């Protein structure tokens, strides 16, 4: 392949990337400069619960529930970041689109005013009904319909109560662009 053709092939995706959506899912560099996960995660159930100083005001997990705690490190420009949360399960699925039923509730710690999130139960949800071959099954994350996008705020951990067997998946978004104005 000649160099001009190769440059043309590379220019089209590059132009599309530069001119499209101005926010991207990123894991910002860890504040220590190490190549480490930015958000630290801990989880406790009713059997191994031990109150931690930073989250002792939140209720202990009830039997059958798991408390997930996301601790965000302090960043210089936290207003440029958001945290996207998805709740679901990793399941063996066929070629159909699958979903789960469950309701994400935002609750408040009485007397403190701090928010936390809870899903009481998760059950099988809707699915398309295409004809699939049994051999085509693969593992995939199947989520409840509710998604949550939170402003990045390192002052207080994000606390979630989910049924045992549920997974909490998250990623950090950073705005790459400046504000546009309409007058």
UniProtKB/Swiss-Prot annotation:
Gene3D superfamilies in the cross-refs: Ecotin (2.60.40.550)
Places the protein is found: Periplasm
GO cellular component: outer membrane-bounded periplasmic space
Database matches in InterPro entries: Ecotin_sf (IPR036198), Prot_inh_ecotin (IPR005658), Prot_inh_ecotin_gammaproteobac (IPR023084)
Domain of life: Bacteria
Disulfide bonds: 95-132
Pfam families cross-referenced by the UniProt entry: Ecotin (PF03974)
Main localisation: periplasm
GO molecular function: serine-type endopeptidase inhibitor activity
Site feature: Reactive bond: 129-130
Signal peptide feature range: 1-25
Family membership noted in the UniProt record: Belongs to the protease inhibitor I11 (ecotin) family.
Subunit structure: Homodimer.
Biological role: General inhibitor of family S1 serine proteases.
Protein name from the UniProt record: Ecotin
Upper lineage: Bacteria, Pseudomonadati, Pseudomonadota, Gammaproteobacteria, Alteromonadales
